[in-house]
């Protein structure tokens, strides 16, 4: 029995499912989840001392690679001054100033401790600002696990949302309206019907929780225009895309300005953190300036601020995101070439330093329906074959992959060599 198998068996005694976040359990791909004990650069090492090229990157934060020395030094330095104060610090202001400088739509910022807190708070703020109750989200998009967002579309063209998880009251879900991603006509029709009741539209500008689905040309600007027409707050959930697809996030990459944005992952440099912000006119409604309540004991935690500030400064150097995107492009081109050579139906997507892999006959991936054409069983086999070859991919056919600046030619060769063998075995 491997060390990971032993640890997983022990973990299940007191941790539900043996993990603290469901995707880690390998339910989508089968087998025993790997337990890691070390990470450095582009690699993670499991409890059995096997090393893997990592394309999960802690689900996005590790854009510099793991254990970047300057980030670790910043955390160590702050560690000597205390873990948490429950009071304002200079670093919080530095972080707010830097985020507002990097993302022009951000005029004011509130720090929180997770992406879920950020999206939950942004939606509450939008409701408080507009005096409206309903929100619009998109099929296949994930915005954290707060009750009003664990909702899927019901039947019919225009319907109230229904809970997608036990424990979410139907009374909460009825205010969440779900429409297809990348379908502007569906949004237009819905707003024509109930626009006066809608507080906000929340969208992942790149849908990263149905693998990686970029927006169709004109889609994000179309949402912007519709929100302006109906007095609806446009929220970009950039927890995944922020500072990754471009330094200014997806909003800079695609040239569309939201009213509010949420961030997480990279902004904490690997520490638990998130933030939301946007127009001063809207953010002024948050307590203590305004009546919309939001608070957090560990918000603006100094260790997280130290890691996040250092990370954001390091990724701000000229050419950083071009290098990241170029590696990702070469990776996907190499995978596509090897899949084609093996006669395997395969298509990839990319947005900067994030990517999607689909075992599909579809010519392109644009909609949720396109995503669902991917052969999940074939992905399972591919995942384990790549694992045997020393490559760690996201353990789900519906999660995005991530590259880091630590990935280079050696990691590319190892990955593509493993993929060539894996594709051959899939015939």
Curated annotation (Swiss-Prot):
Keywords: Cytoplasm, Isomerase, Porphyrin biosynthesis, Pyridoxal phosphate. Its EC number is 5.4.3.8. Transmembrane segments: none annotated. One of its GO terms (cellular component) is cytoplasm. One of its GO terms (biological process) is protoporphyrinogen IX biosynthetic process. It is found in: Cytoplasm. CDD domains: OAT_like (cd00610). Pfam families: Aminotran_3. Disulfide bonds: none annotated. PROSITE patterns: AA_TRANSFER_CLASS_3. HAMAP family: HemL_aminotrans_3. This is Glutamate-1-semialdehyde 2,1-aminomutase. The gene is hemL.
């Amino acid at each position: 029995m491997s060390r990971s198998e032993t640890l997983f068996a022990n973990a299940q005694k007191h941790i539900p499912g043996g993990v603290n976040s469901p995707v880690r359990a390998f339910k989508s791909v089968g087998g025993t989840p790997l337990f890691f004990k070390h990470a450095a650069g582009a690699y993670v090492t499991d409890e059995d001392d096997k090393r893997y090229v990592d394309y999960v990157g802690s689900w996005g934060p590790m854009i510099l690679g793991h254990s970047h020395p300057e980030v670790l030094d910043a955390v160590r330095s702050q560690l000597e001054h205390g873990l948490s104060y429950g009071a304002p610090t200079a670093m919080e202001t530095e972080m707010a100033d830097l985020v507002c400088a990097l993302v022009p739509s951000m005029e004011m910022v509130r720090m929180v401790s997770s992406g879920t807190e950020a999206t939950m708070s942004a939606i509450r703020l939008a409701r408080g600002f507009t005096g409206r109750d309903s929100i619009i989200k998109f099929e296949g998009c994930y915005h954290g696990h707060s009750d009003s967002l664990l909702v899927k579309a019901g039947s019919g063209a225009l319907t109230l949302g229904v809970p997608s998880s036990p424990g979410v009251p139907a009374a909460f879900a009825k205010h969440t309206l779900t429409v297809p991603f990348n379908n502007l006509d569906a949004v237009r029709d819905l707003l024509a019907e109930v626009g006066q009741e809608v507080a906000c539209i929340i969208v992942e500008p790149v849908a990263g929780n149905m693998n990686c689905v970029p927006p169709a040309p004109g889609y994000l600007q179309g949402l912007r225009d519709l929100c302006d027409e109906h007095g609806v707050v446009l929220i970009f959930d950039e927890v995944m895309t922020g500072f990754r697809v471009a330094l200014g996030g997806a909003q800079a990459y695609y040239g569309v300005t939201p009213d509010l944005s949420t961030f997480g992952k990279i902004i904490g440099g690997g520490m638990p953190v998130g933030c939301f912000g946007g127009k001063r006119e809207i953010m002024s409604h948050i307590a203590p300036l305004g009546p919309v309540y939001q608070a957090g004991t560990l918000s603006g935690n100094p260790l997280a601020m130290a890691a996040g500030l250092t990370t954001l400064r390091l990724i701000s150097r000229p050419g950083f995101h071009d290098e990241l995107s170029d590696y990702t492009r070469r990776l996907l081109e190499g995978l596509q070439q090897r899949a084609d050579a093996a006669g395997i139906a395969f298509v990839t997507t990319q947005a900067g330093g994030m990517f999607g892999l689909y075992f599909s006959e579809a010519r392109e991936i644009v909609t949720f329906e396109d995503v669902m054409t991917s052969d999940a069983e074939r992905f399972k086999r591919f995942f384990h074959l790549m694992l045997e070859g020393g490559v760690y991919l996201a353990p789900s056919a519906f999660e995005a992959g991530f590259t880091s600046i630590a990935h280079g030619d050696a990691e590319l060769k190892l990955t593509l060599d493993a993929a060539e063998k894996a594709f051959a075995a899939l015939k």
